[in-house]
């Protein structure tokens, strides 16, 4: 009697074949995440380039916004739909455009197209980092870190306008359009006095400081592996052994501050933690603004400033500035409201 030992070949289905093709070793890895990433990134970028080049915002904001109309890179934009569109997805085949591409562009359909494809493209890029990290068997902290800018994008471009009356109040996709949105945030929400914004600023600027300090310290403590060594010579950038002296760096900062990071793991975790936490906090703050939650309101100072013309603080001055932003910005920025402000209600300094 003969006994045959071996593994029975399982029948491979279409899913296995697709999985093999997606994960094949090639110059640009595709993967399952690529099914989401590449089309969405292509459409988001293509929609933005199309809008900034050819499409006017005259019907939504009363503005010229394309290169074709004379705008430059800083002033062109893909503008948000008008407030009358509310939160409509503005699908090309929807009841608003009814398949008319020109009408769809006039209504602001490119903005929802770019915003939604952009959001899913960013999510696809994060999933790509997860997928490749799993394939090469490393931890997924790159993907976790990238969740921070995704949180900011989604909160600013999607959640905030969803909390307001329509997509109109989201930022337009353009440099000057983003600046307009920042002024709007300050005037209508006093955003710079919001503690979540403060944490975001601390995270971003703190991360820049940490990055500069870390880079400088590594360059300062590179091992000299040959004659005439400097930052760019006498060591191999692909060498397997240690490139710089952590002990020397630790001694240096111990003398500077009295404390220093004791190991590279804690040092690099801190460099990851600071910016990611800051961006996540600012995203949470924007979610609060979507619900019109207030920041710090020092009402007692406002009451005293109203009663005493000689009493003024930097806070009361900022409140006046915010009132000015609202009064002068709203009439132009929200033409659909037909706002008209008589001279006597426009804000003036306490001493005037």
Swiss-Prot record:
Keyword Transcription regulation appears in the UniProt entry: no
Binding site for Fe cation: 214, 268
Modified residues (N-acetylthreonine): 2
Membrane topology: Multi-pass membrane protein
Pfam families referenced in this protein's UniProt entry, alphabetically: Photo_RC
Transmembrane segments: 40-60, 124-140, 152-165, 207-227, 278-294
EC annotation from Swiss-Prot or TrEMBL: 1.10.3.9
Binding residues annotated for chlorophyll a ChlzD2, in chain numbering: 117
GO annotation, biological process: photosynthetic electron transport in photosystem II
Enzyme class name: oxidoreductase
InterPro entries: D1/D2, Photo_II_D1/D2_sf, Photo_RC_L/M, Photo_RC_L/M_CS, PSII_PsbD/D2
Annotated residues for binding of a plastoquinone: 214, 261
Alphabetical UniProt keywords: Acetylation, Chlorophyll, Chloroplast, Chromophore, Electron transport, Iron, Magnesium, Membrane, Metal-binding, Oxidoreductase, Phosphoprotein, Photosynthesis, Photosystem II, Plastid, Thylakoid, Transmembrane, Transmembrane helix, Transport
Gene Ontology molecular functions: chlorophyll binding; electron transporter, transferring electrons within the cyclic electron transport pathway of photosynthesis activity; iron ion binding; oxygen evolving activity
Misc. comment: 2 of the reaction center chlorophylls (ChlD1 and ChlD2) are entirely coordinated by water.
Subunit relationships: PSII is composed of 1 copy each of membrane proteins PsbA, PsbB, PsbC, PsbD, PsbE, PsbF, PsbH, PsbI, PsbJ, PsbK, PsbL, PsbM, PsbT, PsbX, PsbY, PsbZ, Psb30/Ycf12, at least 3 peripheral proteins of the oxygen-evolving complex and a large number of cofactors. It forms dimeric complexes.
Family of the protein in this entry: Belongs to the reaction center PufL/M/PsbA/D family.
NCBIfam families named in the record: psbD
Protein name: Photosystem II D2 protein
Protein's organism: Ostreococcus tauri
Native organism taxonomy: Eukaryota, Viridiplantae, Chlorophyta, Mamiellophyceae, Mamiellales
Encoding gene (name): psbD
């Amino acid at each position: 009697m003969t006994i045959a030992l071996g593994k029975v070949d399982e029948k491979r289905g279409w899913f296995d074949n697709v999985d093999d093709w997606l994960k094949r070793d090639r110059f640009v890895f595709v993967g399952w995440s690529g099914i989401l990433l590449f089309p969405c990134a292509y459409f988001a970028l293509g929609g933005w380039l199309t809008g900034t080049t050819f499409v006017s915002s005259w019907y939504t904001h009363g503005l010229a916004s394309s290169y074709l109309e004379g705008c430059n890179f800083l002033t062109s934009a893909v503008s948000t739909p008008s407030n009358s569109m509310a939160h409509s997805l503005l699908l090309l085949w929807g009841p608003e455009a009814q398949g008319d591409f020109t009408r769809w562009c006039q209504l602001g359909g490119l903005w929802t197209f770019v915003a939604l494809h952009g959001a899913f493209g960013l999510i696809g890029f994060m999933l790509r980092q997860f997928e490749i990290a799993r394939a090469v068997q490393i931890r997924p902290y790159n993907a976790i870190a990238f969740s921070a800018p995704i949180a900011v994008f989604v909160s600013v471009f999607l959640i905030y306008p969803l909390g307001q009356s329509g997509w109109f109040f989201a930022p337009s996709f353009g440099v000057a359009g983003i600046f307009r949105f920042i002024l709007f945030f300050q005037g209508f929400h006093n955003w710079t006095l919001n503690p979540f914004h403060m944490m975001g600023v601390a995270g971003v600027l703190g991360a820049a400081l940490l990055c500069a300090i870390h880079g400088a310290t590594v360059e300062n403590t590179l091992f000299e592996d040959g004659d005439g060594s400097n930052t760019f010579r006498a060591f191999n950038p692909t060498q397997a052994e240690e490139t710089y002296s952590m002990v020397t760096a630790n001694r240096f900062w111990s003398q500077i501050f009295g404390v220093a990071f004791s190991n590279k793991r804690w040092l690099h975790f801190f460099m990851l933690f600071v910016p990611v936490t800051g961006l996540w906090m600012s995203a949470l703050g924007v979610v609060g603004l979507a619900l019109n939650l207030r920041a710090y309101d020092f009402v007692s100072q406002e009451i005293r400033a109203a009663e005493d013309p000689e009493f003024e603080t930097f806070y009361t001055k900022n409140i006046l500035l915010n009132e000015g932003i609202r009064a002068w910005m709203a009439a132009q920025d929200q033409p659909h409201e037909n706002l008209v402000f008589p001279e006597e209600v426009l804000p003036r300094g306490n001493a005037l």
